[in-house]
């Protein structure tokens, strides 16, 4: 039996779990974002290059078929993963990766934003043991879900998905091209020769962003150590609420204050800084208007002083706010969402 034949049941099981997750959670996107992501999912599944024009009729037919298929599997449980005669829990990434080591593959199964399960199986491009975590970088992806987050910290592992990062960048480019606004994304794209050599530019952007993504995920690991297990328990109390979005944004800001902002300032690469601000979510910007103002100051003057002054202050702010949020949860974990929203809203960093 060839390795491809041996691993086909695993590939099918991982992709099935991806489909089940999509069936349950794809509807959480706005219509515009959903359609954009589905077009790029079609591109990946059918093997089209980024610059290829997609056949709209085929995309439409595929979309209808996929949504009908989702209806048939939405209530299925996630499948166990078969590897070398054994079966593994799809969320036990450590055990699955130990079994996959001899095949040169990497797997991840975990929960992302809004408790959405994410799974992927890909070619292991790089594995590195650091002092406080293991870095696993995947190349080609053989199974993935609609969202395909480009990075995730799970336990003592940081997974970076190079192909998903490239696709995320491409989605951002396509989205920006609709309006061509003079914003952080537009400034980041101007650094690269996108119009004349899109593939080379995309590779260069991916190399640039991998360092930034790793900085954030390292910050996530450190933030998790500081916040402890009660943070995830608190998050589990407020699923699908504004409070959940705020809890995630506060942790993101804490992680970035620990590693991302200091690392970006030390690297002094304009493209990396622009990409970072282009990737900030609406809630992150709402909670940290001082950071947006510092970025605007840097853009106008070329002097990063405002960001440099803000970085150490932000760590103290988000650490203290996170502590107060945990106190609320520990004092009374019931009816938590409204109290968290009120606390965080009153603690914006302006």
Regions found by a protein language model. Give the residues of each.
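Post-HEXXH active-site segment of zinc metalloproteases
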Residues: 221-252
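Active-site recognition of the HExxH zinc-binding catalytic motif
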Residues: 208-225
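Basic, amphipathic N-terminal segments that precede the first structured/catalytic domain
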Residues: 97-147, 155-156, 164-169, 173, ...
């Amino acid at each position: 039996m060839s390795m491809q034949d041996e691993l086909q049941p695993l590939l099918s099981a991982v992709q099935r779990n991806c489909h089940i997750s999509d069936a349950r959670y794809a509807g959480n996107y706005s219509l515009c974002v959903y359609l954009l992501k589905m077009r790029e999912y079609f591109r990946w599944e059918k093997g089209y290059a980024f610059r290829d024009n997609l056949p709209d009729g085929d995309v439409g037919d595929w979309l209808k078929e996929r949504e009908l298929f989702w209806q048939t599997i939405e209530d299925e449980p996630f499948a166990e993963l078969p590897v070398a005669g054994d079966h593994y829990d799809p969320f036990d990434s450590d055990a699955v990766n130990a079994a996959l080591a001899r095949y040169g593959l990497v797997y991840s199964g975990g929960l992302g934003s809004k408790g959405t399960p994410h799974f992927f199986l890909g070619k292991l491009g790089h594995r590195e043991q650091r002092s406080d975590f293991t870095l696993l970088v995947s190349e080609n992806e053989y199974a993935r879900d609609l969202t395909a987050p480009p990075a995730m910290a799970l336990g003592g592992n940081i997974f970076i998905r190079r192909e998903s990062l490239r696709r995320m960048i491409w989605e951002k480019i396509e989205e920006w091209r609709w309006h061509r606004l003079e914003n952080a994304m537009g400034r980041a794209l101007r650094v690269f020769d996108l119009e004349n050599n899109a593939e080379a530019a995309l590779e260069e952007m991916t190399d640039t962003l991998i360092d930034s993504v790793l900085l954030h995920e390292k910050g996530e690991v450190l933030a998790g150590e500081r916040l402890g297990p009660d943070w995830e328990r608190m998050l589990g109390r407020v699923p699908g609420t504004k409070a959940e979005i705020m809890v995630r944004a506060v942790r993101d800001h804490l992680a970035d204050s620990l590693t991302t902002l200091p690392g970006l300032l030390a690297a002094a690469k304009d493209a990396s800084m622009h990409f970072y601000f282009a990737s900030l979510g609406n809630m992150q910007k709402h909670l940290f208007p001082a950071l947006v103002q510092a970025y605007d100051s840097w853009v106008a003057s070329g002097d990063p002083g405002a960001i440099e002054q803000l970085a150490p202050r932000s760590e103290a702010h988000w650490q203290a706010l996170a502590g107060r949020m945990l106190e609320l949860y520990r004092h009374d974990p019931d009816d938590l969402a409204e109290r968290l929203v009120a606390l965080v809203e009153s603690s914006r960093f302006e």
